[in-house]
A protein has these predicted regions:
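Charged, amphipathic alpha-helical coiled-coil/dimerization segments
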Residues: 93-147
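Terminal interaction helix/tail motif
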Residues: 128-184
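Canonical helix-turn-helix DNA-binding module
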Residues: 67-111
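Pre-recognition alpha-helix immediately N-terminal to the DNA-recognition helix
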Residues: 26, 56-60, 121
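N-terminal helix-turn-helix DNA-binding core of bacterial DNA-binding proteins
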Residues: 39-80
Length: 184
């Protein structure tokens, strides 16, 4: 923990809130660091400027070497911004990395997305560079228990999702309801 960080945030009024705020601050930094890493790795491995979001979709589409529907993609990535997901999918199709296929012969409107040969080459190059840099760096951090950390992140996802569902119940309430919540 970095004790040099100024703890007087508008988000934290007591020790418990400060701990959560410190955690969320690090979470933001991890997210943006991870995104920069993905994009940099992709740029070096494949000379493309795909975004972190597009790369996540590409790797999830290849996952287990089976096609995925838009619903599966959004659920696997915990996303609800279908418009942006569709935009990213179109970019991946345009770049020849994935293709749209009919997923149900009885339903002409049911589509899924699968990786192309070009997409396999792309993700293989990304994987090789990831192994030579990131995996090697992680080997030096023997004290990191990624399995346990993954479990903690899964628990936090559930907490944030519950908080999101709760806040949705207040959407559209009159301002005085929000004021009452602030007092609690």
């Amino acid at each position: 923990m970095n004790n040099l960080v100024n703890k007087t945030w508008h988000l934290a009024k007591n020790e418990e809130e400060t701990k959560l705020t410190d955690f969320e601050f690090q979470l933001w930094r991890v997210f943006y660091g991870f995104t920069r890493w993905q994009e940099g790795c992709e740029k070096v491995a494949n000379q493309t400027d795909l975004t972190g979001s597009e790369l996540s979709l590409l790797h999830i589409i290849r996952m287990k070497d089976r096609s995925k529907t838009i619903n599966e993609l959004t659920r696997l990535l915990n996303r609800d911004d279908n418009f942006n997901v569709n935009y990213s999918i179109q970019k991946l199709i345009k770049n020849g990395l994935i293709r749209k296929i009919l997923s149900d012969k009885n339903n002409k409107k049911a589509f899924s997305y699968e990786i192309t040969e070009e997409g396999i080459k792309n993700t293989d190059a990304y994987t090789a560079l990831r192994q030579s840099i990131l995996i090697e760096l992680l080997k030096k951090k023997k004290e990191l228990n990624l399995e346990k950390f993954t479990d903690v992140l899964s628990e936090l996802i559930a907490i944030y999702e519950e908080a999101d569902r709760t806040v949705l119940t207040y959407m559209g309430d009159k301002p005085e309801v929000s004021k009452k919540l602030k007092k609690q």
